[in-house]
Each structure stands twice: as structure tokens, then as C-alpha cells.
Amino acid sequence: MKSVLSTATRNFRFRSMAFLAVFFAVVAGSVTAGAQVTALPPYSFSVFATSKKPHYYQPDSIAVWNNRVFIGYGNNAKPDGTSGSSTIVEYAMDGSVIQTFTVKGHNDGLKVDPKTNLLWVLQNEDANPNLVIIDPRNRRSKKYTFSKPAHGGGYDDMAFEGDQVYISASNPANNPNTQQAIVKATLNGNHVDVTPILLGDSNAIDVTTGQQVQLNLQDPDSMRFDAAGDLVLDSQADAELIVLHHPGAVNQTVYRVPLSTNNTAVQIDDTVFPEVSQGVILVSDRDGETVYAVTAPLFGPDPFSAAPTSLDQLNMSTGVLTPVVSGMVSPHGMYFIPTP
């Protein structure tokens, strides 16, 4: 597998050189959270942002663009879109609030299109999904709709690579799931057209055994490209990561990484893949109403995942998770910001 950095990461790093020192100075000087959250040396943490009830609360997805951090707050909106709205908060690197955006429904997916620098905001992971694309520079936005999902649920997360955008098909209606688990998305007027690239019952190679297995993806959730260019999907309730090499191509290959701690299956949410050894991991503790900044002298080469109450280091060869920051309530969204 090739080892390359995405265009978005390279561009972000070049833009970051002047201000990341300020970010780390603020993070290092901020007040740490209560004693219930602890870090295993050499890791340390501090508070980057907190909820501001009743205006915005339940922080989840995190995106970074042009020296800014965007965090989606769910505000207890219904994940099927039947009631409520979410707030997207734009922060400076020192944690100060710049502006906020309101979207109807429950926001779960939040990514920046590296080609247009527009913010893609995806709502309603259980049913009735919609997409809002926002230009943070002028606050212009446009809403897009989906046809009724073939798998019967909603859409959860997005991942960009080149000209392609992929979306995870969440909350499937059937067990076994024979419908789409990952789709390729195309904007068409005010509509999002989707084409399946992975079905819920596809075959895969289990990385821990080398044997072929048939998947039954019951909870497609968070999704991200790793540093090698592979698309990595978290099937949360199934306690496994699904790795797609050459996603959407005729030579696409699929791998399964079963997740565990002490031989017990573990469900995770987001996963980040530090492509350089120095940086900071932002992680949102949704029900703890806090976004933490986690630092270490060196990161890597392993990724890090949001486990039920901790931030864990993940061995992709074995699927074993090892806590490095513990005592959170419910970690969800994550983002790795590299140092220049």
C-alpha cells in the first residue's frame, strides 16, 4: 500500500506553520479537566472547548480548515430528523468562538471538501438524511436532499479523496444487511446521487487470521482515509473496522479488523491516523460536554480511536486497543492536527 499524504493534509500543513505554535501555547496553558480524566504518560491533555447550554451542547464531529476548527453540537436533536437542530461552531486555534451555524436535524458528519474549501454538514444518521454545504467565509449555504436510502436508514459520515466523496450508509433496516454500506456521492442540482461501492454482506479478509469472511455490517458509522490512501469505515455496533484498498475501483479489496481489549469486543466511534509524529489530537467527549486536546512527544505509527470512555491507541494488525486517556464519559469525534 502506498504511503502518501492527502492534498488536504499537505495544504493544511503549509498554512499552519505560522500559527500552530500559538495553538500549542494556549493548549498547554489551559486549565485541565476534572480529576476523573487521566492520561497515561507520556500523553497529556487539556480542554480546548466546552458546551454552552442551552445554546449548543453534545459536541461530536470535528473538522479543521484554514486555521479554524469546526465542531458539530447535536443539541439532543433526533437522529431521524423529526425534531431539533444542531449547531456548528467555528473556533480559532486558541479555542475562541468565531461564529456559529444552525442546521435542522441531528448533525453527525462534518468534513471540509479540500477542493472547494466548503464545509459539508450531514444530518440524520437514522432516517431522512440531508446535506448542507456551507461557505464559512460568507455564511452562504445550500441544502441537498437524498432519495429514500436503499438500506432503509440514514447517512452518517463522509470522506474525501481527489474528486470522490464517500458516505457511510448508517442504521440499516435489515439483518443480514445486503444493501449499501458505503456509497459514492455526486451532487446533482439540489440532490445527492449515490452509488454503492460496498455492500453490507461483502466478503473481506480478516487481518487477524488471514481468512476470508462474509461481513454483516449492522452499524456503518465514522469514516476516514488513512495515510496510505485506504478508506477506513467503523462499523460501530459490530466492533470492527473495515478497510477498503482502492475504494470504488475494479481492484477494490476489503479487510476486516476486529476490535478488542483484554479479549473482549470493543465498540469505537472515530479513529484518526497521525501521518506525522508530532501534533495534537482533538477528541470530543459528547456527554462530558468537553472537547479535549491530547498531546504527546511523539505520535504513531499506530492510529488512535474513541473507545466507550477513553482515547485508545489501536494496533491495526491485531485490533487490540490500549487506553492512553481514560475517564471520559462518551468520546466521539476526533481530528489529528500535525505540527509543521
Model-identified regions with their sequence ranges:
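Sec/Tat signal peptide C-region and signal peptidase I cleavage site
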Residues: 31-35
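Bacterial N-terminal signal peptides
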Residues: 17-29
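N-terminal secretory signal peptides that target proteins for export/translocation
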Residues: 1-14
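Sequence/structural signature of beta-propeller domains
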Residues: 36-340
